[in-house]
């Protein structure tokens, strides 16, 4: 039964209303510093911890709650007579509810003008200590670190005579340990990122000790293959527009492969500006098999589907605009696993109401990217920054005698945008705002070029006058000859080969335009 609560929070969201409800339930309120002042100004009866312990705050507030009268009241097991006798001997009442959140360390170090002393002063000591004490003794103490849990605790107290059930206390305790682990991890990440001069501005993006925090969204029936177990975890700092922020409107539970492919589709389609045109991306095995832009979702889908209607079967489809009824009716004619869009019209939802196995994911558009790109290797972890480099037309270097026409330049930029999301070695034929042939994942670039041209031929699409993007340089002229023989009139590639001069000379010999980006987009 909760008789006494200690409240000490940095995030004061909802704390006054919560304390008012506790007071109405007859709970004695203890508090510290700014929280105590806020509660007193709201007219609530509150006792300062310094008055409660008989020991004043000291060292500029560094020592406030580090006192036996606080921690004894939290840690004492109510089922052990010797613990309760010790409390009675030293006149220590129990503290049955602890509400604490911590100094804003991560927000502090995110500021450009932060200094090491600023960071150090925002390392909370008393807060984590109390939280861990309460979480350890969760059988007897309710502990709250998140304002979102205020309503849950109040509901149980009202229903159970000021008591909170063990299951809730256990859940709240695990939340505390996750929170303090993340907090300490953030401190370690920051401190071990500082160089010899301890400069905040010169800190490394890659700390000596890397702590990452994720929370489980779901366990899955299996992983990439049926014999593998799997789960999906969400980054606690997931950026705006991240796949992990999806809302599933209908459909079966997402599988491991669904999520992997959906992420590839969503990241690719987000790279197209919805303010300029609707875009549609169709993904199969993490590779785009059709990408297009159009005046609306239907036009974009029709063009993307034409690239490779065979591979689109059972694929993942993403749009960067609302999916309306017309596009939904076209998509519904095919077998699709997952549909992703910023929103779905009511009419589009009705189209898929009869196809409840189709998974509809709604995700708000956003420009953010993951802080790190991670890849596990045996006994280790490869960590890199995201491939977020977007080349602008003004940055391209024309290296051939013939310059691209304005239309060719548009096609080249489209092709380059798509090639970034195709597994290496990647060759992409494009024209008129759509992919025409995609060659992905081959060990030699010339084979990717051949496959891309064959795919276009199989789809009945002409490559005459098309633009080609290569995610990395052409090591020899053979790949270039393949795409020109197929009908390409312009090529975009990073450059950087020892044989660049030979490849450029071949382009001039064949009468095509070639531009270099200076940026490679390997994707493995």
From Swiss-Prot:
Q: What reaction(s) does this enzyme catalyze?
A: (6R)-10-formyltetrahydrofolate + 5-amino-1-(5-phospho-beta-D-ribosyl)imidazole-4-carboxamide = 5-formamido-1-(5-phospho-D-ribosyl)imidazole-4-carboxamide + (6S)-5,6,7,8-tetrahydrofolate; IMP + H2O = 5-formamido-1-(5-phospho-D-ribosyl)imidazole-4-carboxamide
One example of a Gene Ontology biological process annotation? 'de novo' IMP biosynthetic process
For this protein, the Enzyme Commission number is 2.1.2.3, 3.5.4.10
Question: Any keyword Transmembrane?
Answer: no
> For this UniProt entry, what's an example GO CC term?
cytosol
| Family matches, as InterPro entries | AICAR_Tfase_dup_dom_sf, Cytidine_deaminase-like, MGS-like_dom, MGS-like_dom_sf, PurH-like
Any GO MF annotation of the entry: phosphoribosylaminoimidazolecarboxamide formyltransferase activity
Q: Which residues does the UniProt record annotate as the domain MGS-like?
A: 1-145
User: Which keywords has UniProt assigned to this entry?
Assistant: Hydrolase, Multifunctional enzyme, Purine biosynthesis, Transferase
Entry superkingdom: Bacteria
> Where, if anywhere, are coiled coils annotated?
none
Pathway per the UniProt entry: Purine metabolism; IMP biosynthesis via de novo pathway; 5-formamido-1-(5-phospho-D-ribosyl)imidazole-4-carboxamide from 5-amino-1-(5-phospho-D-ribosyl)imidazole-4-carboxamide (10-formyl THF route): step 1/1; Purine metabolism; IMP biosynthesis via de novo pathway; IMP from 5-formamido-1-(5-phospho-D-ribosyl)imidazole-4-carboxamide: step 1/1
Per the record, the similarity remark reads:
Belongs to the PurH family.
What the entry says about domains is: The IMP cyclohydrolase activity resides in the N-terminal region.
Task: Write down what this protein is called.
Answer: Bifunctional purine biosynthesis protein PurH
